[in-house]
Amino acid sequence: MFEGPLQDLIDELSRLPGVGPKSAQRIAFHLLNVDPTDITRLQEALGGVRDGVQFCRICCNISREEVCRICSDSGRDGGTICVVEEPKDIQVIERTGEFSGRYHVLGGALDPLANIGPRELNISTLLQRIGGVLPDRELADSTPENKLFDATPTVREVILATDPNTEGEATASYLGRLLKDFPDLVVSRLASGMPLGGDLEFVDELTLSRALSGRLQI
């Protein structure tokens, strides 16, 4: 154990995902030896994330504006919505060049062990985008007033692109049941070939591109 600010820094770095005590210690000692201007830039970047990043009021993606660039792009196909767990998943799909529709970010996946249920995810806003009504009263009660908006009547298909693990599959199954209440809406899931038990961000672009183009209706 070190003392003072150094140990405080190590402790805070250790709280980051994927950073263990040894990695945190290496990062901390690296920061001790970098130019002060680099530290200043890091501080400014951290402050910018805290103060300059918000979530799109339509799709819940990370955005600098009230509406993100994808939702604002009239060239995107508003009739197809790809549902993902996290904003980082959008970047993975965009790199394939296979999808030209719009997205909806759930903000996670169903996980009863972590007390994450439908009310903790951005499901109610997804249902409103599609049909403007909430068939599940519990979801309706959980919708913040400032997130209400008109439905997009042109939505033809919803692609469920949650992670191919236990939580992601449970989330896709739950959404599939909910979305069956909307007439004339096609609900599809990424095709087989995705590695089971993994995260979408680690799937290579070719595999993901094939999974998108060969998606299966559910």
Curated annotation (Swiss-Prot):
A zinc finger (C4-type) spans 56-71. GO terms for biological process: DNA recombination; DNA repair. InterPro entries: DNA_Rcmb_RecR, Hlx-hairpin-Hlx_DNA-bd_motif, Rcmb_RecR, Rcmb_RecR_Znf, TOPRIM_dom, TOPRIM_RecR. Residues 79-195 form the Toprim domain. It comes from the Bacteria. GO terms for molecular function: DNA binding; zinc ion binding. Keywords: DNA damage, DNA recombination, DNA repair, Metal-binding, Zinc, Zinc-finger. Pfam families: RecR_C, RecR_HhH, RecR_ZnF, Toprim_4. May play a role in DNA repair. It seems to be involved in an RecBC-independent recombinational process of DNA repair. It may act with RecF and RecO. Belongs to the RecR family. This is Recombination protein RecR. The gene is recR.
